[in-house]
Amino acid sequence: VRIVFGTDSDSALTRAVLDALEERGHEVKQVAAGEEWPEVGRAVARAVVSGEAERGVVCCWTGTGVTIAANKVAGARAALCTDAATAEGARRWNDANVLSFGLRLTSEDVAREMLDVFLSTEPDESERAAISRVEAQS
């Protein structure tokens, strides 16, 4: 899977996330390195919406800022997740295309669990009509 990754902080967790993605065989591109959260969120979302990447992963201290910025891009569906069940539901029921999380409270193990389910879960086709209504609002 082609993944675009962005963060406004270089930390042990962000490096572990990049390592986990690459270890799992994903093609990973990091964008907006060194930029602040508004640019990071937008850059990740634009890469996903344009088709440059299939999914995005974005993080900042709380995860809130990058999520808001990403969701300003038409066609982006960024979901701020705190655990694997939420990440799975975001894909299954909402067809989220960007996984967002905060660096403040997310452990490396939880980040890896969220990545695994977010990248392996497909949308539930019974939700397609609802997802289309959200897309029409863009």
Q: Predicted segment positions?
A:
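Charged helix-capping and loop-helix junction motifs
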Residues: E39-R42, C81-D83
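Short helix-loop-beta junction
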Residues: L18-V28, G75
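Short active-site oxyanion
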Residues: R2-I3, E52-G56, G75-R77
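Hydrophobic residues within alpha-helices
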Residues: V17-L18, A70
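A short beta-strand-loop structural module common to alpha/beta enzyme folds
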Residues: E27-P38
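Short, structured active-site "lid" loops
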Residues: V40-A69
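C-terminal binding/interaction regions
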Residues: V4-G6, D10-L13, V17, A84-S138
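Mid-chain, well-packed structural core segment of small domains
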Residues: V58-C59, T64-R104
